[in-house]
Amino acid sequence: MLSFVDTRTLLLLAVTSCLATCQYLQSGSVRKGPTGDRGPRGQRGPAGPRGRDGVDGPMGPPGPPGSPGPPGSPAPPGLTGNFAAQYSDKGVSSGPGPMGLMGPRGPPGAVGAPGPQGFQGPAGEPGEPGQTGPAGPRGPAGSPGKAGEDGHPGKPGRPGERGVVGPQGARGFPGTPGLPGFKGVKGHSGMDGLKGQPGAQGVKGEPGAPGENGTPGQAGARGLPGERGRVGAPGPAGARGSDGSVGPVGPAGPIGSAGPPGFPGAPGPKGELGPVGNPGPAGPAGPRGEVGLPGLSGPVGPPGNPGTNGLTGAKGATGLPGVAGAPGLPGPRGIPGPAGAAGATGARGLVGEPGPAGSKGESGNKGEPGSVGAQGPPGPSGEEGKRGSPGEAGSAGPAGPPGLRGSPGSRGLPGADGRAGVMGPPGNRGSTGPAGIRGPNGDAGRPGEPGLMGPRGLPGSPGNVGPSGKEGPVGLPGIDGRPGPIGPAGPRGEAGNIGFPGPKGPSGDPGKPGERGHPGLAGARGAPGPDGNNGAQGPPGPQGVQGGKGEQGPAGPPGFQGLPGPSGTTGEVGKPGERGLPGEFGLPGPAGPRGERGTPGESGAAGPSGPIGSRGPSGAPGPDGNKGEAGAVGAPGSAGASGPGGLPGERGAAGIPGGKGEKGETGLRGDTGNTGRDGARGIPGAVGAPGPAGASGDRGEAGAAGPSGPAGPRGSPGERGEVGPAGPNGFAGPAGAAGQPGAKGEKGTKGPKGENGIVGPTGSVGAAGPSGPNGPPGPVGSRGDGGPPGMTGFPGAAGRTGPPGPSGIAGPPGPPGAAGKEGIRGPRGDQGPVGRTGETGASGPPGFVGEKGPSGEPGTAGAPGTAGPQGLLGAPGILGLPGSRGERGLPGIAGALGEPGPLGISGPPGARGPPGAVGSPGVNGAPGEAGRDGNPGSDGPPGRDGQPGHKGERGYPGSIGPTGAAGAPGPHGSVGPAGKHGNRGEPGPAGSVGPVGAVGPRGPSGPQGIRGDKGEPGDKGHRGLPGLKGYSGLQGLPGLAGLHGDQGAPGPVGPAGPRGPAGPSGPVGKDGRSGQPGPVGPAGVRGSQGSQGPAGPPGPPGPPGPPGVSGGGYDFGFEGDFYRADQPRSQPSLRPKDYEVDATLKSLNNQIETLLTPEGSRKNPARTCRDLRLSHPEWNSDYYWIDPNQGCTMDAIKVYCDFSTGETCIQAQPVNTPAKNSYSRAQANKHVWLGETINGGSQFEYNVEGVSSKEMATQLAFMRLLANRASQNITYHCKNSIAYLDEETGSLNKAVLLQGSNDVELVAEGNSRFTYSVLVDGCSKKTNEWGKTIIEYKTNKPSRLPFLDIAPLDIGGADQEFRVEVGPVCFK
């Protein structure tokens, strides 16, 4: 049956089945419902369709030769098999089907008895190759073969005996930190010191004991951050923390050494018959043989006209299965399959003993910042910080309490004149006094208003020349001038670097056919040609006359061993032959099975040292080495998880004060300390905002009275004078009530740091703080000990065919094997020379129907027939377990648009949710419950078949899929010997599902049974994981009406809103046993969370549901009585569902193809160029997209793939640096780094557009891991600057330095691992012309590339210039 199923379907379904099985194992057992009673026997079905052609009957006795009949008309084409091989309960037939069509013409009949001795005929055609002769004697030893390629590295040898103690080794690398010691016992608290008496004010004394903390003042505004202090000296290395919790899975480690070979697999299935090989070259003509034994019947005459058809033979019994063929040759090694899914995390292994100190690794990349260390002790006083910018004015604080009354101030200045008193009553008129003295001049009157503008004055005389002004600031650059005329052509530039090879050009047009040559001279007569191969077997000739027995001819020489012929049909058992003479010693047979292990041989001489093998597994820990010297302090490790509390340790001595730590976070408020001494006076703060007005001061004391003058005459009141100048301030009045605090003044400059106070007693340990957030993933840890072996995984998918492995070393010749079985029949030989035509025999009488001859050789394959109609939909397969959640597949190819279905009933609008922030895309949510079925859309037209895709890799075996279209009929197999007809056995207990048996004889139809009781509803199943989103199916045909089932348990409420009660169930199929619940359908779009509404009224009845699946669940048994036979070709049997299945399979196939064969595009990048070359060997070198770190393709990078060398090349950005002339800070005889010093810290970068430098660094790190070789070149363009060899001195002292990626310096001479080579050196002498030197560095340590910087030495002169051109870095 399987031969009719589309192989792709099986592969895809196999994957689904395997995943489902895994999921089933994980999800725990599912309670299976009780098996229902067996239903009654169904009614007698309608007459089945026509049965298949019966098997040919046994051979009849040979008939007499028939008279030649007239030529028959061409036979109609046979029916195309549309075998749907399905079990059916309905296939009870009322008897044998109608007689089948006439079968194909049978093979020629058996050869008749030998006729009488004929005349000596002409030499017959060469006979078929004889059976394989006995093995010849052992030949002489062949010449030694070429040395085989190196074999795979052997397993690591056993450890040798301990050698003599060597000399004192070099200083070892620092060992790993020891395990943490137990915590020391807490020491006794020291006695509190006595408080010192205050001394006389003198030189500032040592700081006193800290005073008690004062009451906490109001929190000051946060000061501006000071400048970052200098990095303190590194503290001593901390004790090793306890082992942290298991970190996230690190990136895949380097590929380990090859494991030991697995156990031999079970013998594979018999391979298909290989294609007929091309005939081998003809061997040299042998010597003419002696006269052979009398030949068989003479040359076959032309076949007679076909006889009349014989009677149809009785149906033969099914033949016994044939003998299993010999196992096929092992196929070539498959290409490594994709990496299997990560196994479950093994249990944590025990900590192994410390291994011996490893060799020093290369400097690692800079690690992520460690977690914040504990706060160090206060550092020494820093330098005075810069004055901060003034802060914003603070809000006014509350009014403070009234201050104490101040002591009386010093005597104040006289107060201002008091206000005039109230006017007294008018006095009596006095007597006229004498004339007074002229009074002083009155106060100047108020200035008059400005007069009108006077007439313009005459121009003044010119002034003296003023001093020359200061030079003004440089003006802004002027507008660009017009472009100047085109200058003369410059000298021809130097040749650029060799570019990447261009893509391969298209094939040229085929050349014109040449003219016909002159006919050649006739050649000399050739040697006799070799015997031709057998001609095709002719039809049997007429029965010859009985010949007389010829004389025994001499034995001919043994012929060449013929090729094994194809397997012939089973002949009748021959009579036992006479015992033959013992044969000569045969040729060496094939290697026998592996013998038992021999005793160990003597130790051989030491061979030459072999190549370095791949790293072996870790050996047992060696003895402890001598203690190495203390290593350099390592970088702080990331904080480990808290270990269990240790025993208290002894009190340690006071440590040396550490360097100043970085500013820690604000600690919790401490207890109140003792009052400290006054600090040094700070710099006065800025003047605050004016306070509120004070209360009026007391009146000042009256001044001393002056001598009274004579009374003057009463003057008339003058005009009111202007306000006089303010009088002097009066004495200070008493303190007014405290005003509102002024606005906060600007922050004063930071005072000098006070001296450190004495460290207070250690506070009690605070409660453990909450766990901080997880730090960033630490750097990749060293490789952990191997976990325990995981459970045996499921068989991986067969890998793609790998390249053939290297030839192994030729083994010793095996012992002679037993004589091989008779070989299969060799391929048909070339046609022999045409024999002379025999005379036409007389027409014999018509023969009886002959026994069926053996099957003829299969004819050449006919032209493919037209595709048969779609087979019937197969019976539903076993319900698969829900598959595990697959990774999100790539978007499938858009299917053809179906016609839109009618609109469904619109749901009630949900409440508007608040707008959420745009989140990162979440993982697919759990699937909601399936919504109600919409009205069925009209069927869309089926799409045309797409082009066949590339062949995918072999998938996991799938569950049985729907029956595919019938394949073309295979060639007739050879008929085996007829078996005896067995008696009908008793019915046995139900066994496990076996393979499909041969068709049994039809039994009589039973009476119709009674309808069975309704089955119990099954238990509610676990919610399945979401499957791949299927294509929306077309509405199925309605099933036969059944009884309504009980209401199932309600599913979990989906998030999409209130769901009404389920509508009435549609008609169901015939009741079967309750099956396992099916997988949940595709998830709908997740709606916003609706509030739980009241249950709505029952909806209208839905459309009829699709037919129910056949019951049986996992109690699947083949209980059908018969196969359902072929459907007639004309009946339309293609159901609409088949289109959906076919489209889904095509989509899955395309997605898997895409995963397995990357295209090098941005959406489907490869991992490296090597993967692209393996997937598309016909592609040319060009730019492609790759994604070395896999995962999301958003950070894929565009690289140049050089398929001729297998390299992945990444360009620097930018490639050229601008030319640099004299660099003023260049010191004599000192290299200057271009990026770090001259360009202000910008090193060479290798960015790709759209990818950040961090992402690019990650991709480069993965490229280094994936490659085992790297190379790069850099071109130094110079003018009067030496780049490598100084031709004047012949030294390399002025050669440039290069900085690699791991901070290694690459030099011109020295250690060969770190020296670069020079391809072109045009900068060896100073010629006032531009030249260039091309430097190349190749390494098998990809971590050293790409170049990050270059440091020339010979620069800085007024006539010196240089620039750099960075070539691409290529990984392989």
From Swiss-Prot:
Family affiliation: Belongs to the fibrillar collagen family.
Question: How does the record describe the protein's post-translational processing?
Answer: Prolines at the third position of the tripeptide repeating unit (G-X-Y) are hydroxylated in some or all of the chains.
State where composition is biased (Low complexity): 95-146, 231-260, 285-299, 306-327, 336-351, 390-416, 476-495, 519-537, 600-639, 681-716, 725-743, 755-771, 792-801, 855-882, 905-927, 957-978, 987-1007
Q: What is this protein called?
A: Collagen alpha-2(I) chain
Q: In which tissues is it expressed?
A: Expressed in kidney glomeruli.
Reported function: Type I collagen is a member of group I collagen (fibrillar forming collagen).
Q: Which residues are glycosylated?
A: 183, 1273
A GO MF annotation of the entry reads: platelet-derived growth factor binding
Q: Where in the cell is it found?
A: Secreted, Extracellular space, Extracellular matrix
Positions that bind Ca(2+): 1187, 1189-1190, 1192, 1195
One of its Pfam families is: Collagen
Ranges of compositional bias, category Gly residues = 544-553, 640-649, 781-790
* The species this protein was found in: Mus musculus (Mouse)
Locate the compositionally biased regions of type Pro residues.
Answer: 59-77, 1095-1107
Q: Which parts of the sequence carry 5-hydroxylysine?
A: 183
Q: Does the record bear Signal in its keywords?
A: yes
- Say if the entry is tagged with keyword Disulfide bond: yes
Question: GO CC terms on record?
Answer: collagen trimer; collagen type I trimer; collagen-containing extracellular matrix; extracellular space
State whether it acts alone or in a complex, and with which partners, per the record. Trimers of one alpha 2(I) and two alpha 1(I) chains. Interacts (via C-terminus) with TMEM131 (via PapD-L domain); the interaction is direct and is involved in assembly and TRAPPIII ER-to-Golgi transport complex-dependent secretion of collagen.
Major localization listed first in the record, in broad terms: secreted
Locate the compositionally biased regions of type Basic and acidic residues.
147-161, 744-753, 1011-1022
